[in-house]
Amino acid sequence: MQRSRASSTSSGRLQASQQVQPLDAPKIIVIHPGSQHLRIGRACDLNPLTMLHAVAYKRKHQEGDWPYHDPMLPSLDNINPAQLQVEFEEQRLIASRILQNCVIDDKQRLRVATPPQQLAHFNRKSVAEKIPPPGNLSEERNRQWLDRDAPVLFDEQILRLSTFDARDYDIHFPIQRGELNVHKQKGGSLQCTLQHIERIWSYALEARLKINLRDLRTHSAVLVVNDVYVRRHLREFMTLLLQRLGFQRCFLVQDSVASTYGAGIGFGCVVDIGAQKTSIACIEDGISQLNSRVRLQYGGGDINQVLLMLLRKCGFPYRECSVQDSYVDARLMDKLKERFCHLNAKVCGAQEKQFHLRKQNGQWLRYTLQVGDEAIMAPLAFFHTELLNITGKARKAFTQQPPQEQYDCEDCFDAEYLRETGRKNGARAADPIVAQLLAQPRPLPPITADDEELNVVDQDEPSSNGVAVHNTSSPSVGHAQKHFADTANGVYQYGQGQVMPLDQAVLEAIGRCATNETKRKMYGSILLVGSSVKIPGLAAWLQSCISQQVQPGTEVNVFTKGMDAGMVAWKGAAIMSVLESARELWITQVDWSRHGLRLLRERSPFLW
């Protein structure tokens, strides 16, 4: 396994303070946190434990204290609901015309769509049927469906909260849109968010994996992190694992790199579509290419909202569905997306579907409905992103800033620190490594602490090149910042101010690779991973869209691994953890307490 070249210092590289112990897979815990799910398990496990990455605290009813609920799905844009409906209908008609022009066989026959009005005629007459509990659930288990006396709820218990029950709890999802969910409301500070994560992970380790927290001092941890990361957050994760949870040692790995290990490939463009974000990165020899990384703010949850909007237009029989107020309904839409949606143009006409739902009184109901092009139009929003405007038009693309543009007051080898000390002591410039750091251009300081390591490309802000450039009174400083955004972080262009479609984002990411040979290799190995790539036909559709936009003769291959796509990164991290070459990546609890951030600079498997 190759790794990034760590930044050297005049004092040389750190030496491990302890003898490396033999690797023991049952003692290695692999953790892959996401916006909606947490995947955690031993490195020797066939599959990880997958649970909801959320926690619910029992409220103390006090005057003026209102319950706080993080939404499970992205919220609808409520600025102008009437205008939103009109615009959505316009885009639905455009997408419908695109589908009607699809050829479905060798005889050049076109698709035949079923109008929503015809489907609504059937669906409005559909009546829910009472059925016994599925899976022969016992009456005793039904009575224990929800433990209302528990002070803290996790996983399935949260998903069983009705709108009425949820009023007694504050519910937090500590990660949203791929990063820590830090906000200004109740329980939204950085330390509170880390406490939520500690609670969830402790529950998973103790209650589900049956590992006593006191025994973690004999266990190791591998944490899968995003390709586009905030260095301050990674530092907090290390402290959480080694000092608060008490693991003996740990190391971090980027999710796209872990995915290549899980898929068994040495290079490729990894497209990770999660519940609330889509990230793209080009991997070569185990290294994530800096300029190719991007995180887009849409995912499977946005597709759920599009699907619900489309189903309502054709008379969705479950009229009380409210994904914003009920986690039960939000989970239902997630299941309907997995069961109904596809990207197979040959499937057309009305299809009769059924789904089951448990009501608050314990009664199970079965709904029957007809679905037409709604099943293909919802995932088509990945490529016709105007449909995603219902969850907000103000979208941002995040790319990773180079190390010299990131600041950390606790890192004594930070580029900014070296500049400041170099001014006071000119003799330090004699060191060639320090001199190289001092010679790098200096960008403007960040606007906020939470986004200090992220370059934000916002299509709503006017800019000649698609990069949001902060207003400044100094033209030279503004030009320097623009230069950094253009050359180091990449520019993700948007058509008519619209969020970038999936195929265009992949083309842009691969286009930023250094050589034509690397680009050719990336086009030939596009790996789809993540919980939202299970839609049948998605890989073939993306491959067709990309093939039409590259030079003739370029081989394009989009594929998924023959396993649960959401587990590929976890499995890859488990494989990495037991490799002989990964021994030098481990950071022990003692070393972290003694050296801190310097260890990440020296040993992280990616450029710090």
From Swiss-Prot:
Q: Name one GO biological process term.
A: DNA repair
Q: Where in the cell is it found?
A: Nucleus
> Which key words are in the record?
ATP-binding, DNA damage, DNA recombination, DNA repair, Nucleotide-binding, Nucleus, Transcription, Transcription regulation
Q: Where is the signal peptide?
A: none
Looking up InterPro entries in the UniProt record yields: Actin (IPR004000), ATPase_NBD (IPR043129)
GO cellular component, alphabetical, reads: nucleus
As one GO molecular function, the record gives: ATP binding
Q: Cite the binding residues for ATP.
A: D272, I273, G274, A275
One of this protein's Pfam families, by short name? Actin
| Positions of the UniProt region annotated as Disordered | 1-20
Q: Tell me the superkingdom of the source.
A: Eukaryota
Q: Which CDD domains match?
A: ASKHA_NBD_Arp8-like
Q: Which family does it belong to?
A: Belongs to the actin family. ARP8 subfamily.
Q: Spell out the subunit comment.
A: Component of the chromatin remodeling Ino80 complex. Exists as monomers and dimers, but the dimer is most probably the biologically relevant form required for stable interactions with histones that exploits the twofold symmetry of the nucleosome core.
| Record function comment | Plays an important role in the functional organization of mitotic chromosomes. Exhibits low basal ATPase activity, and unable to polymerize.
Its name, as the record gives it, is Actin-related protein 8
What organism, scientifically named, is this protein from? Drosophila pseudoobscura pseudoobscura
Q: What is the lineage of its organism?
A: Eukaryota, Metazoa, Ecdysozoa, Arthropoda, Hexapoda
